[in-house]
Amino acid sequence: MISPTMEQGESLRIRVVMGKDRISELPDGLLLKILSSLPTNIVVATSVLSKQWRSLWKLVPNLEFDSDDYESEHYTFSEIVCKSFLSHKAPVLESFRLKFVNFNPVDIGLWVGIAFSRHLRELVLDFYPAELGKGVTFTFPSSLCTCNTLETLKLVLCILVDIPSPVLMKSLRTLHLEFVRYKDESSVRNLLSGCPGLEELRLYRGDDSDIKVFTIEVPSLQRLTIHDNNDGPEFWGYVINAPFLKYLLIEELRCPEFCLNAPELVEANIAEVTSITIEKFLGSFTSVSRLLLNLSPLKITYPTGSMFYQLVSLEMYTREAEWWNLLTLMLENSPKLQVLKLTDRSQNFHKDGLVSGKWNEPKDVPECLLSQLETFVWRRFDWGREEEKEIATYILKNGRRLKKATFSTNPIESEELNKLKERRKVLNGLDGVVRASNSCQLVFKFDPSYLGSDSP
């Protein structure tokens, strides 16, 4: 029985014999770029095509191995990886990606060591044991944090970060930690403090109780992503000190505390924050110029006296109960706001009771409506709700600088005549509003994403 790689190569060779081999006429540099985008088992398979291809694959600067792709009666996965490294001749290894089900720590340490000796720039380790959830982990030790050329490190799933003492990866710019575990809080601090040039950090955490406080203190950090659904009682929250942070994305956060020092923050996208009640949470973002909020005002306390003096673009989701109360507060405290976008991400236009309460317009017209707001977009506008019609009317009546207002709604089947008539009546009503801005262009359209994607 021949290996899958040999079978793939034979198939390629047959196709080349039957037709003209035009690919081989391309320059070697271009061929290497093409091969670099393919998994290593496919790249190795091209070696049967000709003498040119036999030597060409050995110079591909990327090695990618997935143990699921290598099932052979002749060689183990470990032997295949070792043979590939022995044959590989590229002087600089741009990327080494390893996805494995079972492992021998000695083998992995050897492969990573060889990759480091070839000036490795990206390392991806993805361990998904056959018995996921049984506590089996691969320990990522401090001895692997020694590569001076490494620019990107990605650790995925059942990997235990165990770094008892400080390390140094002076060239590391990007670090992804996706559902890994941590020996203790010291391991987190030692890893992050050993990356003096780190610019991007992505954290994905599940329901674990490895640490009580996740501390991120990285002066060079510019981009931070957090997705954390850990709501265990042992986990307190985050302490982040990133004086040069420019971009923050929080996809999910269930911990009770969040302390952020990021005075240079420019853009923040905040969603699915469910347990934080501290008033200063929103106050951490007063320096931003662009802000996206998908929050429930019933779960987040607005910071008294906080002003968003730099905010020029605000996007809010409209599916949470009494979301308009948060909108009112943001309008009142964002005097330079120029762009306002409202989106119903749920695609459920009548929200089935998720939205409740009644909107009350501000006592005084917010400064941004009087002098700054130029663009107003409402995606998946729920024309059937009185509160949303009132909010839309209020903004049109008071937006003195408004240049364009766009409302998109869900498609309605042609046989639903009553709905078609009602929607036309509502949209005609908006069109008839006496707008504060004579130059405001009003646009109505259907939202095509309603039919397929749930993305905003």
UniProtKB/Swiss-Prot annotation:
It comes from Arabidopsis thaliana. CDD domains: F-box_AtFBL13-like (cd22160). Pfam families: F-box, FBD, LRR_At5g56370. LRR repeats lie at residues 74-100, 102-127, 152-179, 180-205, 225-252, 270-295, 318-344. Coiled coil: none annotated. Disulfide bonds: none annotated. SUPFAM superfamilies: F-box domain, RNI-like. Keywords: Leucine-rich repeat, Repeat. Gene3D superfamilies: 1.20.1280.50, Ribonuclease Inhibitor. It comes from the Eukaryota. Residues 358-409 form the FBD domain. This is F-box/FBD/LRR-repeat protein At3g52680. Residues 20-73 form the F-box domain.
